[in-house]
A protein has these predicted regions:
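Terminal presequence/propeptide segments associated with secretion/organelle targeting
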Residues: 1-486
Length: 486
């Protein structure tokens, strides 16, 4: 997160990415990138019964998804009533439990220190995700609050935030054999995925996603000069792409050297045998095993198109157009019925993301990225392509990349979305204004909206089905492990 703010504050004449940054006094600290926040977890509450209220075993996939989402949004709205908290509902044990996490949202965050590239990115990513790592990859923010101790917008009168508790950093240094601990905020885990999912992840998804990332890295580098404004605009993106490309590659290599899939296959077979060895267990858990297996097979059928669509967001301006039009559509609904990301609680973030584009976008790079992504999209079977996308860009099974590139060129020449004031104005525009626009990228967003929503509806139906069966499968895993004394 530090790197994004360093990039945002860098220019060719004042390249903090290369030179580093140090605020020797409080007043030397500089604002971070728009939307930067510090979150302090204050409370974690089990809300499983609240989230699953009204849900029954016979509830359809889409209805289950909608009911759980509505219950989540209601809990979050109550939790955020003070105006100073950002709350979320997270599922644990694959949806077997749900917890409401209440976090203080500190909005005035300033950059204090960032190392020079020669320290912070020493050696590149060659030893990233490995131990030991010979890189000074760290930085410092300072969080500020109002004089009353409550979160506030940026002001010179604000004071440093004082947490209720903290760890002291020793100035004594370390010695051979000292205890070392890695500290991090809990994220997610895939350790309870099925053998079929694990195999797909390591043998298909990670290699494919790595290649996508490496290709986009090459496109950015080929279309921007090192140290130029264009390259600086994408340094944070490059770091993110490279970070997970290395992660995926390392996991694939480790997987190939291990007997992991054999052990996972054996463990899953033992679980199924344990379930089937008892009539009560078979009645309780066997349906979940079978249904989950069928859902996974169904989900894998569209994996290529899902992957391509997941990377389309790297084309900045078309992505912005889609988000802006989606906002206009969502604003027609009561706030509680809007899609997460488009509620009133999200509008400040959405505005800040539109502002940030001004320092994280270059037209040449964006056009080249979109050209690449559409070339990958065109490789999909016709049934997985969008009629609106095919029509707008002139894509068919026999793609003429030159023709597609000309459509891209013409669209970027005529769009005004590269202008920040225009993007911000669209935030307050009506559906009718979008539909009447002659901006080509806005027109594309309008034309493709119905198909995008149809795909989203299919995805929600599938997610609702997973929400039905994953918790029962997880319940079986827990019961089996307990039978082994684990």
């Amino acid at each position: 997160c530090i790197y994004g703010s360093v990039q945002y504050n860098s220019t060719p004449d004042n390249n903090l990415l290369v030179d580093g940054f140090l605020a020797k006094q409080f007043f030397d600290e500089i604002p971070t990138a728009p939307g930067t926040r510090v979150y302090v977890t204050e409370q974690v509450t089990d809300v499983t019964s609240n989230v699953l209220s009204g849900v029954t075993p016979s509830t359809s996939g889409i209805d289950r998804y909608k009911m759980i989402e509505a219950n989540r949004k209601s809990l979050i709205a109550d939790c955020e009533s003070s105006g100073n908290h950002r709350c979320g509902v997270s599922s644990f044990h694959q949806g077997l439990e749900y917890f409401l996490i209440k976090r203080l949202e500190v909005r005035d965050v300033r950059l204090v220190y960032a190392p020079a590239t020669s320290i912070g990115k020493y050696g590149g990513d060659i030893d990233n995700w490995q131990w030991p790592r010979h890189t000074g990859d760290f930085g410092f923010y300072r969080a500020y609050v109002g004089t009353d101790g409550q979160p506030a917008e940026y002001s010179e009168d604000n004071v440093p935030y004082a947490p209720a508790s903290f760890l002291e950093v020793s100035a004594k240094g370390v010695e051979e054999g000292d205890f070392v601990m890695g500290v991090g905020y809990p994220g997610g885990t895939n350790r309870y995925r099925t053998t079929a999912e694990v195999e797909n992840e390591f043998e298909w998804y990670y290699p494919q996603a790595r290649d996508f990332r490496e290709d986009i890295i090459s496109i950015i580098n080929e279309n921007s000069i090192d140290g130029s404004a264009a390259r600086i605009a994408y340094e944070s993106t490059l770091a993110s792409l490279s970070n997970y490309s290395k992660n995926f590659q390392s996991m694939v290599e480790s997987y190939g050297k291990s007997d992991f899939i054999d052990r996972r296959t054996e463990a899953e077979a033992n679980l199924v045998e344990w379930i089937n060895s008892d009539s009560d267990r078979r009645a309780r858990y066997a349906p979940a095993v079978g249904q989950l297996e069928a859902l996974i097979d169904s989900n894998h059928a569209a994996r290529e198109s899902d992957l391509v669509r997941s990377y389309m967001g790297y084309a900045t301006l078309p992505s912005a157009a889609h988000r802006l039009y989606r906002l206009a559509m969502e604003k027609q609904k009561p706030d509680a019925e809007r899609e997460p990301g488009y509620q009133e609680r999200d509008l400040r973030r959405l505005r800040q993301s539109m502002q940030a584009i001004s320092r994280r976008f270059d037209e040449t790079v964006d056009k080249a990225t979109l050209s690449y992504l559409l070339s990958r999209y065109a490789e999909l079977p016709e049934q997985y392509r969008s009629q609106a996308t095919d029509s707008f860009f002139g894509i068919s099974s026999n793609i003429d990349q030159g023709q597609v590139d000309q459509v891209i060129e013409d669209s970027y020449a005529l769009t005004s979305l590269s202008d920040e004031a225009t993007r911000l104005a669209w935030l307050d525009s009506s559906v009718e204004e979008f539909e009447a626009s002659d901006d080509p990228l806005i027109r594309y967003a309008v034309l493709s909206y119905a198909e995008r929503m149809a795909l989203e509806l299919e995805s929600k139906e599938l997610r609702g089905q997973f929400q039905r069966w994953r918790p029962e499968y997880m319940e079986a895993v827990i019961a089996y492990n307990r039978s082994l004394g684990q």
